[in-house]
């Protein structure tokens, strides 16, 4: 997969200065909220610093934020996670080990 540069180039998400659009959305929202709450222009500098942190997060895997949002949409929203013992609801008992399978 890493050797096929055309495939990687065609499937790479859109970025702004090395940060994916999902990461930029988080950065802009957090910086804007902090700026509105504090009315301090140094929060814009904090947003620039946060941009470099997000750039390091997505440096090696550009799908980090997509994985995070997929986790939040599936397992993160489960209100009865302890009852079912998993990320999706199923009426069937979850078999965790091979010994439980043989019962």
UniProtKB/Swiss-Prot annotation:
Provide the primary localization.
membrane
Q: Which GO terms describe its cellular component?
A: cell outer membrane
Keywords, ordered alphabetically: Cell outer membrane, Membrane, Transmembrane, Transmembrane helix, Transport, Virulence
Q: Which residues form a coiled coil?
A: none
Task: Note whether Transmembrane occurs among the keywords.
Answer: yes
Annotated localization: Cell outer membrane
Q: What is this protein called?
A: Type IV secretion system protein virB3
Source organism (scientific name): Bartonella quintana (strain Toulouse) (Rochalimaea quintana)
Read off the lineage from the record. Bacteria, Pseudomonadati, Pseudomonadota, Alphaproteobacteria, Hyphomicrobiales
Q: Which gene encodes it?
A: virB3
């Amino acid at each position: 997969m890493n050797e096929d540069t055309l495939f990687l180039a065609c499937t790479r998400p859109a970025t702004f200065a090395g940060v994916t659009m999902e990461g930029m959305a988080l950065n802009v929202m957090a910086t804007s909220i902090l700026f509105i709450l504090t009315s301090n222009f140094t929060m814009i500098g904090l947003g620039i610093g946060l941009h470099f942190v997000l750039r390091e997060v997505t440096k090696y895997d550009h799908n980090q934020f997509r994985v995070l949002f997929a986790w939040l949409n599936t397992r993160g929203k489960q209100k009865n996670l302890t009852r079912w013992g998993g990320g999706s609801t199923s009426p069937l008992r979850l078999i965790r080990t091979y010994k439980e399978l043989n019962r």
